[in-house]
Amino acid sequence: MTDSKPSVSVIIPTYNCETYIAETINSVLNQTFKDVELIIVDDGSTDRTRQIVASYGGDVRLLTQLYSGVCVARNHGIREAAGQYICLMDHDDYWFPDKLALQVDEMKRRPETGLVYSTFLWWFPDTHGVFPPPESFTGHMGEIGIDEEFSGWIYHLLLLDCWVLTSAALIRAEVFDKCGVFDESLPYSEDWDLWLRISREYPFIKLKRPLTLYRQHPNQGNRLARAIDYRTELLTKAASKWGLCSPDGRCLTRARFKKNMARYHMEFGLKNLVAGNVELANRSFLKSWITSPARVKNLAYIPAALLGWRPKW
């Protein structure tokens, strides 16, 4: 890698995000760490997103493609990236100014690390749909330091939940050569799938300080009912392939894994029950009980659903 190449490549896939894309771009350009290339991959936007990005001129490299989905757009950016480290940022999130500086410093101090991530803050709109300014969160920044519990070899912990927010991560570029990129066949949980693969080959570091704002919308996709439970499919596949232990020997007990899977089956069932998919919901409630028979209460949802009960969310 020559000196002319950037230290960090920031890749932002975007689609119809004219309302928020400028704030996201500005948060990257305002980083205290300046050795950065910013790549925006426009995934066939039909609003003014592309024009807004183009207005930044040489500060941003704009790539365009026909609408293909976020995984394809991210992988497009990864192929074009020249940096030693790569960040993948969602088009409506926000970085605090020291995000890259703190993460790059940690990467340099720990060359064996494949991924550095941080805590993040949920960013909700008020009752009028207005998001509070990022400056209003400065009182919630907390201490600088490493969260040891969620650092190191964390594969076994990733079998419980997707602890890594995509926008909050910094990844060593060589990781993609060894572990692959985003699985374009997955419509959901594609980030979790990648983190699981990386966690088999590299230790992670988690910084305690929140460095990213994660913007939330009322109809956000991760809250909607789906026909397939991608979470349980992903975790079942991972456990079957790699077991329940991290490379350093730390393990998740089978009982805890099953209890967690039962919880996911139940959550999937409740989402589908709210959406009116009673048959699918009841199958999920039954799977939850079969996975963890101690959760007898999950069986009670089946007759309740048939009698017309719905959770009030």
Question: What do the predicted segments below correspond to?
Answer:
Residues 1-29:
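N-proximal low-complexity "stem/linker" segments adjacent to membrane-targeting elements
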Residues 19-22, 45-55, 94, 98:
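Acidic helix N-cap motif at the loop->helix transition within catalytic regions
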Residues 27, 34, 42-51, 67-68, ...:
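A conserved acidic beta->alpha catalytic loop
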Residues 65-81, 91, 102, 153:
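Glycine-rich, basic loop-to-helix element that forms the pyrophosphate-binding segment
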Residues 79, 118, 137-233:
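Conserved nucleotide-sugar donor-binding catalytic segment
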Residues 86:
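Short aromatic/hydrophobic "clamp" motif used to bind/position activated sugar donors
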Residues 98-137:
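Conserved donor NDP-sugar-binding/catalytic core segment of glycosyltransferases
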Residues 202, 210-218, 223-248, 274-291:
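Catalytic core of nucleotide-sugar-dependent glycosyltransferases
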